Swiss-Prot record:
Enzyme Commission number(s): 3.4.22.-
Protein name: Extracellular cysteine protease
Location of the active site: C245, H341, N362
Signal peptide interval: 1-30
Residue span(s) of the pro-peptide: 31-221
Naturally occurring in which organism (per UniProt): Staphylococcus epidermidis (strain ATCC 35984 / DSM 28319 / BCRC 17069 / CCUG 31568 / BM 3577 / RP62A)
Molecular function, one GO term: cysteine-type peptidase activity
Annotated gene: ecpA
């Protein structure tokens, strides 16, 4: 009898142990199980050093991404659809340090990345930081095409002065997005190498094309209450390896207000600097006086304003079919490439939480971005910040 009882106890203990081990391994490997949802079967896995995201960053992304996406959809005449956020990821320098920002892909119902939310720490000396707004948000198509190209692959996204790179598991580094540079001399003296150091210590990945269910919307729940933009604004070109941001800006604005396609950045720069050749021409910029002069030469009464234009001013000028050029200076550093930058105002809007925003086109990007109308600090796609210190309006 004792032998039978001992045998039964042994069997029960073995069963309990096997059950516990099974639960443990199922839990431990849950992330590696294949997804049943077809949209998730091919996911882009981006390498990250850790997945720690501050609560303030999560809250900002959750609360503001959908209204800004709805606005960009409307401004670009995209059909409204439901969206969700993918897993947050980071971008690294070649020394393996993060660029300091947090990135969330915005996915449509098919699982494609349509936009990217960039959340960056505000500079300590900025107006937003002094108001205890520790982070700023920007939504644009930045890197969306790149992430879609690497579906079902594991990559590390790297950046330096030359642009953005994808490092694949076979060790191949590919330049996927070029960053414009302001002058050839600075570029040649850049010390960053495009040969990455050992990145094997990056143990975790973010499945950026895998929806985060807690942020998923069953429909386009947010909408833009009011959108006012230059009727014929189109993005026909983006800035390459040159210093022609002002040329791109004025071309886009004049093409919009004249409803034409005859302006382009190179022809504008050639008109203003006819005697320059080669590298001197490619890496020349424009002064505010030259921008004023060109606008007036094209029949526009362009005017200089020594500050950011207000929301109401943008609204009135846009309604009157008058373009505005943003003159910005980089907050992080006044030296080197991208120290000064021009951008175009495409319009203004109110989203359904009552927030006033200004639609801006950065010549580096292939889409518009949303700027808080109460802040003169513009966070651009790569995480830098520009102080909107002056405007030229009337294009």
């Amino acid at each position: 009898m004792k032998k039978k009882l001992s045998y039964m106890i042994t069997i029960m203990l073995a069963f309990t142990l096997s059950l516990a081990l099974g639960l443990f391994f199922n839990s431990a490997h849950a992330d590696s199980l294949p997804q049943k949802n077809g949209a998730n079967q091919k996911t882009t896995k981006v390498t990250v050093s850790n997945k720690d995201v501050p609560d303030a960053v999560r809250k900002l992304a959750e609360e503001q991404y959908l209204s800004r996406v709805a606005l960009l959809d409307k401004a670009s005449n995209h059909k409204a659809t439901s969206y969700t956020l993918g897993e947050p990821f980071k971008i690294y320098k070649f020394n393996k340090e993060s660029d300091g920002n947090y990135y969330y892909p915005v996915l449509n119902k098919k699982g494609d990345v349509v936009y990217v939310v960039t959340i960056s720490p505000n500079p300590s000396n900025s107006k937003a930081s002094k108001q205890q707004n520790n982070y700023s948000i920007n939504v644009s198509p930045f890197l969306s095409k790149i992430l879609n190209q690497y579906k079902n692959q594991k990559i590390t996204i790297l950046t330096n002065t030359k642009g953005y790179f994808a490092l694949t598991e076979d060790g191949k580094v590919t330049l996927v997005l070029k960053t414009p540079r302001n002058n050839e001399k600075t570029y040649e003296n850049a010390t960053e190498s495009t040969k990455p150091k050992d990145l094997n210590d990056f143990k975790q990945t973010a499945s950026v094309t895998k929806p985060t269910l807690e942020y998923q919307s069953t429909r386009n729940e947010m909408y833009a209450e009011y959108v006012n933009q230059l009727k014929n604004f189109r993005i026909r070109e983006t800035q390459g390896y040159n210093s022609w941001c002002a040329g791109y800006t004025m071309s886009a604005l004049l093409n919009a207000t004249y409803n034409t396609n005859r302006y382009n950045a190179e022809s504008v720069m050639r008109y203003l600097h006819p005697n320059l050749r080669g590298h001197d021409f490619q890496f020349t910029g424009l002064t505010s006086n030259e921008m004023l002069r060109f606008g007036r030469s094209q029949g526009r009464n362009t005017q200089y304003l020594n500050r950011m234009t207000s929301y109401n001013e943008v609204d009135q000028l846009t309604t009157n079919n008058q373009g505005i050029a943003v003159l910005g200076k980089r907050v992080e550093s006044s030296d080197g490439i991208h120290a000064g930058h021009a951008m175009a105002v495409a319009g203004n809007a109110k989203v359904n939480n009552g927030q006033k925003v200004i639609l801006i086109w950065n010549p580096w990007d292939n889409g518009l971005m949303t700027q808080d109308a109460h802040s003169n600090i513009i966070p651009v796609s790569n995480g830098d910040h520009y102080e909107w210190y002056a405007s030229i309006y009337g294009y």
